Amino acid sequence: MLVLLISLVLSSVTRAEQMTTRDAPMATLLGFFDALSVENYPHSNMQDWVTDDFLIFEMGQAFSWDDFAAFLAEASYDTWVSTEWRLSEARVSLTEGAAHISYVNRGEFVYPDPDNPGQQLKESNMWLESVYLINEEGQFRIKFLQSDNVSRVVESLP
């Protein structure tokens, strides 16, 4: 009986540790999108969320972090009104020192219409995304993000 009780306690501790461990890469992913939001951009600590050799595949192109920041600047990202990402259906896989997360990302952006001054656009997207994270000194950081746009709707706001 005592062996069974000890087994149950150890089993629940292992599950609790696993839950906490799986939460760490998700916290990094959510932190990345929070840092990327227009309310916080440019985030002075973006390097807390990505590795030095970070790579993102977006819109059929490969970007380093510096290249992606330049792309955002070209899109006048600093003039955007709002950005919102809702992540769902996350699947986390862990190995020693690394994690992989696949998820659905639904984003909604409001920004000035570049072709019609004074007009704002609302863009709604759905992406299937995947990130590979590595553990650097006890902190997960995103090394690679793959983003495939499934749907995109742009409408003028009244």
Feature names for model-found ranges:
Residues 2-49, 156-158:
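Short, low-complexity N-terminal intrinsically disordered segments enriched in polar/charged residues
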Residues 77-81, 107-122, 152-153:
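Short, cysteine-centered beta-strand-loop-beta hairpins and adjacent loop/turn segments enriched
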Residues 57, 102-104, 143:
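Beta-strand residues in well-ordered beta-sheet regions across diverse protein folds
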Residues 50, 105-107, 146-149:
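Short beta-strand segments enriched in hydrophobic/aromatic residues
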Residues 43-95, 121:
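A solvent-exposed, acidic/Ser-Thr-rich amphipathic alpha-helical stretch
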Residues 84-87, 102-104, 122-129:
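Short, surface-exposed coil-to-beta transition loops
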Residues 100, 124-157:
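Short beta-strand edge/turn micro-motifs at domain boundaries
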Residues 96-111, 126:
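A short hydrophobic beta-strand element
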